[in-house]
Regions:
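Exposed, low-structure sequence patches enriched in small/polar residues
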Residues: 1-216
Length: 218
């Protein structure tokens, strides 16, 4: 009998209206998000084994945003009954459209409120992301254990093709000369490491270390 698993997933998303930007600024407008599709495939080796592998691949596409890819794998190692180690890592290369940038006051702007005319600036983006999660559980004895979780994370956002919204609840845009640089990169490291020792029944000692580092490059 074959205990491997294999999967395919197709997703079709119609055009929708998005109001997320109205929470950023009360002058923002509801915009339209384009229709997009995705295809996802994966397989998993026999879960009864000491070593389990689950790679996957995903591709998504929109007419404006273009084609993006994501791929990764999860590996689980159980060499003995008291040791469990897993690593789950993924790489994402995804373009996007209609990414909020800024509101620019402009005497010739498209929109107007009590304070004057303004333009709502958007951009196309390219997001490159690397995310890894490592988990380790060791039971030295029934009274002494060690648990570890570590997650390095990196994301880079590149902004290009700045434009201004032409009409609310639409994808209508006009090229816009924007002098700012919105590109950024984030490097994060998070982790929790816990040592537990029950040196006598009902009496426990915990040693805990938490890691939380974040660097933002702009």
């Amino acid at each position: 009998m074959n205990y491997w698993n294999f999967g395919l997933e197709l997703e079709f998303n119609p055009e929708t209206y998005q109001d997320d930007d109205t929470y950023r600024d009360d002058r923002a407008k509801i915009i339209k998000d384009e229709a997009w599709q995705s295809f996802n495939t994966w397989f998993t080796t026999d879960r009864r084994k000491k070593y389990v592998l689950r790679p996957w691949f995903k591709i998504n596409k929109g007419e404006i945003r273009g084609i993006g890819t994501e791929y990764g794998a999860r590996i689980t190692l159980k060499p003995t009954n008291n040791i469990n180690f897993s690593i789950n890592s993924s790489i994402e290369d995804r373009p996007g459209s209609m990414q909020w940038v800024y509101i620019v006051d402009n005497a010739n702007g498209t929109f107007e409120d009590a304070n004057g005319k303004y333009d709502i600036v958007y951009a196309n983006i390219k997001r490159e992301q690397l995310n890894t999660e490592l988990r380790l559980n060791i039971a030295f004895t029934s009274r002494m254990t060690f648990e570890a979780f570590y997650q390095p994370f990196n994301v880079k956002m590149d902004y290009k093709d700045y434009s201004s919204l032409e009409r609310e609840k639409s994808l209508s845009i006009n090229p816009f000369s924007y002098n700012g640089d919105e590109d950024f990169e984030i490097d994060n490291q998070r982790g929790t490491f816990v040592y537990r020792w029950e040196y006598k029944p009902g009496s426990l000692v915990y040693i805990v270390y938490n890691l939380n580092l974040s660097l933002i490059h702009i």
